[in-house]
Swiss-Prot record:
It comes from Mycoplasma pneumoniae (strain ATCC 29342 / M129 / Subtype 1). It catalyses: Release of signal peptides from bacterial membrane prolipoproteins. Hydrolyzes -Xaa-Yaa-Zaa-|-(S,diacylglyceryl)Cys-, in which Xaa is hydrophobic (preferably Leu), and Yaa (Ala or Ser) and Zaa (Gly or Ala) have small, neutral side chains. Pfam families: Peptidase_A8. Its EC number is 3.4.23.36. The keyword GTP-binding does not apply. This protein specifically catalyzes the removal of signal peptides from prolipoproteins. The gene is lspA. It is a multi-pass membrane protein. This is Lipoprotein signal peptidase. It comes from the Bacteria. InterPro entries: Peptidase_A8. Pathway: Protein modification; lipoprotein biosynthesis (signal peptide cleavage). Keywords: Aspartyl protease, Cell membrane, Hydrolase, Membrane, Protease, Transmembrane, Transmembrane helix.
Amino acid sequence: MAKAPTFFSKLLKQILFANRKPFLYYKLALILFVGFVILFQVFMLRAALNGEKGINGANGTDVARSSFISIYVIGNKGVGFSLLADQPGLVYFLQGFLSFIALFFLVFSTSYNYIFWITTLAFGSLGNFFDRLTSGSGEVLDYFVFSGGNSVFNLADCCITFSFIGLFLSFLIQFFKEMKQTKS
């Protein structure tokens, strides 16, 4: 009598299916390229703008202005909108956990669209995590202010935000495609 497949055997089968050659090579190339570009830009912008930050991050410095975006440099010990600034352990945990979950989903992704957006999410979160870890003060450097707003973001925050929007739109497109196929 055949044994029923266990949870782990099903999981292994899904992992192997989602990571077969040559798809795996394209997947890894996309992940490494997008991840490198995001982390490189995060740290290049930090290096370029770190000297512009006010003393201990208390005062921001207005670096450049345009009609769409301004560069205003400030340190931020919290997550988005300076939430949890007084709980650094929770901030590290949330950013690390978000990165781990995103990287976990990458293992099972078979769509280049999802791979791109999940990679952008994972490395945006990792960019903030490593930025905070290497800053010496436990803060990220925020510098983008979009017109009509008062909130200050960095490139990693933008990657996280755009990846959630991209994933949502990808899910909607896939949902409507599947709905259309079931009707015909």
